[in-house]
């Protein structure tokens, strides 16, 4: 093997994150927000599927929505910008198509969900959180490469492990617990 070449692969991801009821919630909120909304969700390891234990679901989701709604969308050269545009119109259309299909199948937009008019010089989409009763809805199942977080409820550890592993894009995952 005289000519072994180094290779760097860009792999697909639909990374799950789970928060158990004993987790440090502030730490989890900060990590989840940075993980999905950092780089406008355009990372193969963005934590785009969130599983919350039932006992903390409502309170945690309310705090997460509040954080997401405060994210400043804008141009990359503006000092107060916290999240910039998507990389292409094709990507924007794919996100919108998946959100529409998810809503038609019972998903519920909790914040964001529609393209932004912040500028006509880019493809802007706000931080978006969608509640999914089923972890196989389009925004929870398909790689979107955008600031779209699907949120689902679970009761027991074995249940959430099965759901986390039930996706073809298994690249990384995150667990918040004590």
Predicted regions and their residues:
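Conserved C-terminal structural/oligomerization subdomain of aldehyde/semialdehyde dehydrogenase
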Residues: 18, 72-73, 117, 124-178
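ALDH superfamily catalytic-core signature
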Residues: 1-134, 157-158
